[in-house]
């Protein structure tokens, strides 16, 4: 058990996007965009040769080219830095989808918790912070997780590579908070 501030951490899992196809597509698109605009900028701005049948002005190319390259590099870095951090502490369940979202669910707000296998694409439309026909999901890879029913009746799925341990820890802490 770890300490975070004055809170004891009973379970902690850090997950990142590891889907090979995602990374092939993302890195491939980034390399293509950087190469494409890099070639065009060198050809037109440095060598003075028109790039394309209707070329941009040098100023527009000097703005759009690096802007598009930075955008693609930024998207790639964002996916690289995304982490789903799930913690069970004394006062509740902490879910962080760093750097985008942070949520704390007190145990008294969890009506039920069960481990289940799910279909990320069919049920939620993929991975990430998703809203689907079965409620909201936080997931980054795989097809196993913990299904919660919250006190307001909303279902919430948390994807996990250790779903049994996560479910057991949530239920243990949840039962203690009900006593």
Q: Can you name each region flagged by the protein language model?
A:
Residues 1-59, 165:
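N-terminal membrane-targeting/pre-transmembrane regions
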Residues 69-114:
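Conserved beta-hairpin
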Residues 159-179:
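Cytosol-/stroma-facing membrane-proximal "stalk/adaptor" domains immediately downstream
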Residues 67-79, 128-129, 135-140:
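Short, solvent-exposed secondary-structure boundary motifs
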Residues 58-67:
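Membrane-embedded or membrane-proximal helical elements that form or frame transporter/channel pores
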Residues 48, 74, 127-128, 159:
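Glycine-centered small-residue hotspots that permit tight backbone geometry or close packing
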Residues 63, 72-78, 145-150:
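Alpha-helical transmembrane segments and their immediate juxtamembrane interface regions
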Residues 13-18, 95-157:
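Non-transmembrane, membrane-adjacent beta-strand/coil modules in membrane-associated proteins
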């Amino acid at each position: 058990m770890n300490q975070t501030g004055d809170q004891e951490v009973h379970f902690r899992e850090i997950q990142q996007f590891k889907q090979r196809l995602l990374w092939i597509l993302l890195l491939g698109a980034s390399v293509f965009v950087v190469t494409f605009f890099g070639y065009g900028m060198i050809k037109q701005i440095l060598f003075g040769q028109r790039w394309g049948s209707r070329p941009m002005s040098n100023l527009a190319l000097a703005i759009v080219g690096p802007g598009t390259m930075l955008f693609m590099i930024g998207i790639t870095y964002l996916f690289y830095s995304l982490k789903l951090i799930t913690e069970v502490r004394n006062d509740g369940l902490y879910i962080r989808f760093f750097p985008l979202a942070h949520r704390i669910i007190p145990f008294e707000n969890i009506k039920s918790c069960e481990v289940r296998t799910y279909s990320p694409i069919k049920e939620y439309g993929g991975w990430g912070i998703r809203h689907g026909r079965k409620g909201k999901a936080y997931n980054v890879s795989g097809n196993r997780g913990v299904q919660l029913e919250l006190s307001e009746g909303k279902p919430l799925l948390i994807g996990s590579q250790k779903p049994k341990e996560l479910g057991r820890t949530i239920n243990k802490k949840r039962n203690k908070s009900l006593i």
